[in-house]
Amino acid sequence: MMRFTPPAEPANFEEKVRKAGNNWLVKNPDTKPKDFWSTFKPELAKCCHNLCNYSVMFIPSRMGTIDHYLSKSKAQNRHLIYEWKNYRYALQRVNSCKGTYDRQILDPFEVEDNWFEIILPSCQLILTDTVPDGDRDRAKFTIKQLQLQNSEWVIEQRQEWYRMYLENELNLEGLEKKAPLIARAIRKQLN
């Protein structure tokens, strides 16, 4: 993980999502929320440079999802279902793993850039010593629950980005745009 800056709310979000969604909730209080947010997925993806806010690797917008950081499935979060500030761009698999854990999972808008690093050549994600003591347990839980540390699917994806760099299919500047944590690990090796 690395820190992402919360994107600015789109100009027409208020009308198309917040008002429409909250009006729908008033009329359907006991029903699963209607998806008004997905029309803004391409915009959220673009604001995040098509990087999953959790795995920090490129995903095309059609493969990404809008994660409700505070789960839309919990009654106490219903007022946040149609709030832009509650949306994170995530790989579907990561979003599914996150489930309803909410604040047990670190928020990509609140972590610091140097809390995690990739170890090469294994491509495993580790916590650094810079993670504050008060956040270490959540950080460990986050990478375990979201399968970000060393699960087969994430290692395979990271190794492919690393291979592309090693075989000159992608330069370091290009890698920085597609898998910034791997680019950071390479820069660390080069210094």
Enumerate the predicted regions with their spans.
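Sequence/structural segment immediately N-terminal to covalent heme-attachment motifs in c-type
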Residues: 44-48
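Extended charged
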Residues: 1-43, 57-61, 78-88, 92-191
